[in-house]
From Swiss-Prot:
One of its GO terms (molecular function) is RNA binding. Residues 8-68 form the Sm domain. Keywords: RNA-binding, Stress response. The keyword RNA-binding applies. Belongs to the Hfq family. NCBIfam families: Hfq, PRK00395.1. GO terms for cellular component: cytosol. One of its GO terms (biological process) is regulation of DNA-templated transcription. InterPro entries: Hfq, LSM_dom_sf, Sm. Homohexamer. RNA chaperone that binds small regulatory RNA (sRNAs) and mRNAs to facilitate mRNA translational regulation in response to envelope stress, environmental stress and changes in metabolite concentrations. Also binds with high specificity to tRNAs. HAMAP family: Hfq. This is RNA-binding protein Hfq. It comes from Bacillus velezensis (strain DSM 23117 / BGSC 10A6 / LMG 26770 / FZB42).
Length: 73
């Protein structure tokens, strides 16, 4: 049985749904936008047509504007 990767499922679902998210960084700063892509180390966030590449180790929390449906089985 393949292990479930909740992080990748979550990020992929908010990317596919174009869900707006608030990204809280470890330094307390907040970024708002849409996830356009991600890999093992970074998340590409788009805000008002501008892109920001954020390193995952700097992220504390993702807060989507709506609930995200995941398949955990």
């Amino acid at each position: 049985m393949k292990p479930i990767n909740i992080q990748d499922q979550f990020l992929n679902q908010i990317r596919k749904d174009n869900t707006f998210v608030t990204v809280f960084l470890l330094n307390g700063f907040q970024l708002r936008g849409q996830v356009k892509g991600f890999d093992n180390f970074t998340v590409l966030l788009e805000t008002e047509g501008k892109q920001q590449l954020i390193y995952k180790h700097a992220i504390s929390t993702f807060a989507p504007q709506k609930n995200v449906q995941l398949e955990l089985e």
